[in-house]
UniProtKB/Swiss-Prot annotation:
Domain of life the protein comes from: Bacteria
Binding-site list for Mg(2+): D69, D88
Protein name per its UniProtKB record: Thiamine-phosphate synthase
Native species: Shouchella clausii (strain KSM-K16)
Example GO BP: thiamine diphosphate biosynthetic process
Keyword field: Magnesium, Metal-binding, Thiamine biosynthesis, Transferase
Names of required cofactors: Mg(2+)
Length: 209
């Protein structure tokens, strides 16, 4: 898996009336280099149709396409991989289903979970939520940038910081040791999605100096 910097997750509830593929294409044009379909409410058929279209989009731009949770959908569209949470199918079982070459990401909220994911062969981990977020109703309390520092020190696989990350607070995240961030609303809810992506990347670069 090649390194990525800016990871965008779909959030159709934040751009009513706009097509998800159109929004994600603008995000990619702004510098997003990996995308994930996250849909907890639509029918499986609808999720599959979106996944097909997003897979084609990602392929056209030469970037990975990840499916959140729906392993069957990921297999059906030959996605680059899946992202699973702590309450989803255990990582070793996911690997059996997907095979050795697909990307598997795992959400983690504490160091114990991060180390477990690494031991079980995760390709990357999500680290968060760093800040309070309203894009997920079932999230745990914010883990703060202290968790980024812990992961940076103890975990060797790639990680991506997620949760409430905005242009105004991304410096804290980068200075804590994150090299990649994952966002939903800061990109997909923006009036100008491409510009929002570019602004986040610019803020990350500035913080990295």
């Amino acid at each position: 898996m090649k390194p990525f910097r800016l990871y965008a997750i779909t959030g159709e509830e934040f751009h009513p009336g706009r097509d998800v593929v159109e929004v994600m294409e603008e995000a990619i044009q702004g510098g997003v280099d990996i995308i994930q379909l996250r849909d907890k409410t639509s029918s499986k058929k609808a999720v599959l149709e979106k996944a097909r279209r997003l897979k084609k989009l990602a392929a056209d731009y030469g970037i990975p396409f990840i499916v959140n949770d729906h392993i069957d959908v990921a297999l059906a569209v030959d996605a680059s991989g899946v992202h699973v949470g702590q309450d989803d199918l255990p990582l070793p079982e996911v690997r059996k289903l997907l095979g050795p070459d697909k990307i598997i990401g795992v959400s983690t909220h504490k160091l114990e979970e991060a180390l477990e994911a690494e031991k079980n062969g995760a390709d990357y981990i999500g680290v968060g939520p760093i800040f309070p977020t309203n894009s997920k109703a079932d999230v745990v309390d914010p883990v703060t940038t202290a968790y980024i520092r812990e992961v940076k020190e103890h975990v060797t696989i790639p990680f991506v910081a997620i949760g409430g990350i905005k242009r105004h607070n991304v410096r804290e995240v980068i200075e804590a040791g994150a090299e990649a961030i994952c966002v939903i609303t800061e990109i997909v809810a923006a009036r100008d999605v491409k510009a929002a992506s570019q602004a986040l990347l610019a803020a990350m670069e500035e913080a990295s100096q």
